[in-house]
């Protein structure tokens, strides 16, 4: 890799000696869109890390309205579009998570978004998005092991006026956005923005007849900024969003063809969410240092209902209602000029407290309870029938006659029947407290060489109070005698854990030339917090009910639990923190007098106790997090971005390769143990590729100033859907295009997505609710087209 990097350096040197007639230049986004950075002292492409930045205009060209869309154009960074807004899985360099602790951090206008359930937001009126890949734990703490995403709204001090955007597309897609930016004076500015978006959806449930992916969402945000001559500044912000949608359009997957059917679940999946992110930021720029205080309060209330078996027969449903309140406080200081001409520093502390209450019952329906009742009924009938036959035969009746007579007697007396009802209610309180202290120094060893040293101490306290139960009510009608017996298993327990980590970082950057091209190398530690699985309680309790079913045949029975039982449960539901070491080398090259930016990086990660999301236990009633022993991932990332034709042609090309494999991971015990050593880590694409080109035709007309022709493509694959690598998604590509017209204060944009109507799956899962393993997947969205009309005044 170092030889390849040296070759790139040589090419860069040659390129810089080449003078082109084209005067087009590509600027770092830090030079164009300046935002508050309370911790960093250098621009992104001057730091020892891999990153991708997107401006407002670039996001509009790509048609990106949320992080799922943005991820399509970032190498080795994937947020698949599936499920609902609750689904916020992100996979970066072989690190990822479907549930519980996230693999990346998300900052919205400088506020850390604390709930993973809130990551999948509608993005609008943004000036800039930065995606940092690789562990960012030194400055940003736990759960930034895969990277960090920072989103920034327009600054009303720099951006004034009003905007209205109206959009309409196929499948009854509609969108309305309105925003106003006002600068009262040099000391006070305000922005207000709101949106509504909805869509009929692509996938019709063949059982219910409803669209399984229709949605409506709306929200608003406020940003008030104050600046004072004394060096102080204040920001007050609030961002509220509401979503109401059908979701989880999973259809049966044909493993041979790789194609998924339309969804056919008995119960329509739904998701509703209220989410508020608010913050108060206080800053001061003094002599030699900057001070920043960031306080936030966040509220999330949601409700998910999902058909857990995804079949047209009613087996089971799961309800999940979350109520979360979070508070964060961060204080940071950094130098605003080099001490002694060579030392820049950052120091700070972070505190957060989260309160989360989850109501998560599992409902068992007729397709599951009827076979259980029939099985018990058959056992009862056989036992009574055999006893009657024996009695008759003892009196001298022939066996055949005794069998017939016993059956007739049972039928005449009212027969034997058994009705079973089951449920698994549960309420879980899982508060968390996090405390971190950090320091980072950047030393200018020479005019071109910079060394970075950082360290963070991170402490997490997590606890759980679970009140969970499972019951089986059996109503027996035995030859005219009716009785109901209830078998119940209830757990009411508590557990707690403390985790602490030191998160160091060492980096070095060497500037190659006066164009700010540089080479870098870095070593950093990543960390993802441990915690508790709550969705697996129904599986634990159902296993207990099956083990004690016979006791309920004689009357009501409550399964007893000893302190040893609770200790075993606490060990079963907990999972350990995930820890990784990341080794990375790379280059940020500015070529042809800044007409071309070329970023190249290579990484190797060693992961211990990798957290994986799997279906719980024997029945697959819910997802749970488990720890694999060890894994590793390695790969490369390359990004090219340039301008040609006097700035009229914008283009970019991104490629990422990740090879993520298990080194130690054995699931199960004894004869049932399965080793996944050398298997690929699931849900991680091996290749990611994206490209975009926009050509502007300057028309010079007073009515039509210019026209833009643009096209983009993104590619992913191969992706495995399980630890055994038994099935997956082959590599696929999705093509998009748009034509934009500049009419002065009016902008018109015609767009199309998935122009070739590529058939692919964004997610797949299996379960054994029916007693045999079934496979399901969600299709990627098919062809769609539409139009945007924007007004600015």
Which residue stretches match the model-derived regions?
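C-terminal beta-signal and adjacent terminal beta-strands/loops
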Residues: 356, 369, 527, 647, ...
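Gram-negative outer-membrane beta-barrel transporters
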Residues: 334-335, 346-352, 447-451, 593-607, ...
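N-terminal periplasmic accessory domains that precede
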Residues: 67-70, 90-94, 107, 143-165, ...
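Transmembrane beta-barrel wall of Gram-negative outer-membrane proteins
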Residues: 161-163, 168-199, 203, 207-245, ...
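N-terminal periplasmic "start-of-domain" segments of outer-membrane beta-barrel proteins
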Residues: 26-60, 87-89, 157
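Membrane-embedded beta-barrel scaffold of Gram-negative outer-membrane proteins
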Residues: 281-286, 290-306, 518-522, 535, ...
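Short acidic/polar hinge/loop motifs at secondary-structure boundaries
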Residues: 109-135
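Solvent-exposed loop segments that connect transmembrane elements
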Residues: 204-210, 248-264, 309-316, 363-425, ...
